[in-house]
Design a protein with these regions (language model features):
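Beta-strand signatures of extracellular beta-sandwich domains
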Residues: 49-53
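A short beta-turn/strand-edge loop motif at beta-sheet boundaries
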Residues: 41-46, 105
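Noncatalytic modules at the cell exterior or secretory-pathway interfaces
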Residues: 30-37, 86-113, 118
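Transition segment at domain starts
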Residues: 1-30
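C-terminal interaction-tip segments
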Residues: 2-4, 8-13, 102-138
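Exposed aromatic-hydrophobic patches
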Residues: 21-25, 76-86
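Solvent-exposed serine/threonine-rich low-complexity stretches and specific carbohydrate-binding patches
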Residues: 10, 63-74
Length: 138
C-alpha cells in the first residue's frame, strides 16, 4: 500500500525557523514521493524556504538536504518529486523550513503551509512499454 503523509501538517502556522516531525519511510516500496507544498496564507514582504532531509537513524540528518523546494513568496502549490530509490540508507524523512522577512512593519514572518508526500507506486515489470507494443505489431 502506498504511503501518504505530511512532513508539515495541513494549516500549520509557521512563524519561526523549524523542523517537522520525523517520518519512517522504511516500508516504502518505490522510495519515490510526489511532494506538494501548499501555502494557504501569508503576509507581504517575506519568503519561505522548505527542504526535505533524510536520515538512516532518525537522529542525524546530515549537512545537505535531499530536496530543496524553490523559495516561495506567495500563496499557491509547488509540486516536486523526491526519489530516494538509490539512497538505501535513508529510512527517515523530515522537513525543515526557514522564514525571512523584510520591510518596515511587523517584523515577524508568518506562513500557513502544508507539505504532503504521496508515494509513487512502483511500476509493474509486466506492463508493456510502448516500444514492446510497437515491436509486436511489426
Amino acid at each position: 500500500m502506498a504511503l501518504n503523509f505530511s512532513l508539515i501538517p495541513a494549516n500549520t502556522k509557521l512563524e519561526a525557523n523549524g523542523d517537522g516531525e520525523t517520518i519512517d519511510i522504511s516500508s516504502s516500496e518505490s522510495r519515490t514521493f510526489f511532494c506538494r507544498l501548499t501555502i494557504s496564507d501569508q503576509i507581504e514582504q517575506e519568503s519561505l524556504d522548505v527542504s526535505v532531509w533524510g536520515s538512516a537513524s532518525g537522529q542525524d540528518f546530515g549537512k545537505r538536504p535531499l530536496l530543496k523546494i524553490p523559495q516561495q513568496f506567495y500563496r499557491g502549490t509547488t509540486k516536486m518529486v523526491l526519489d530516494v530509490s538509490l539512497r538505501s540508507e535513508v529510512k527517515f524523512l523530515r522537513a525543515k523550513w526557514e522564514l525571512n522577512r523584510w520591510g518596515r512593519v511587523a517584523p515577524t514572518p508568518m506562513f500557513v503551509a502544508e507539505l504532503e508526500l504521496d508515494e509513487v507506486p512502483p511500476m509493474s515489470r509486466e506492463t508493456p512499454t510502448r516500444r514492446a507494443v510497437l515491436a509486436g505489431k511489426a
